[in-house]
Amino acid sequence: MQRPNILFCIADDAAWLHFGAYGCGWVSTPVFDGVAARGVLFENCYTPNAKSAPSRASLLTGRYSWQLGEAGNHICHFPEDIKVFTEALEEAGYDVAFTGKGWAPGNPGMKDGRKRQLTGEA
C-alpha cells in the first residue's frame, strides 16, 4: 500500500475566510483550493493559544498549551521529552521539510547531539 503524501500549511495572518475553498469570492487562491479539493480540508479548527510559538507547539505535538510545559510560552526552550509529529513521520520513513517559518521563536533543544529540527530540514 502506498503511503499518502502529507502537506501541512500554516499561513500567518490569514483566516479561513481568505480562501476560496471556504467560500471566499474576493481572494483568489486556486492552488490552495485545488489541494483542498483533493485532500482533507478541516472545517472546525480553533487556535489553542493566541501566541504563534505556543500555537505551533500545540499543532506539532497534538497537545493543549497547558500540557506543554515551557513550550506553552512564547519564547521558550522546547522540552526534549515531548515528541512532535514530524519526528514520528521521519521515524516512519517520511521525508520531512519546511519552507518559510517553522517553529519559533525559541530554542528547539538538542536531539542526538545536534540542534533539533521540530519542523524538518529547511
Give the residues covered by each predicted segment.
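Formylglycine-dependent sulfatase
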Residues: 1-122
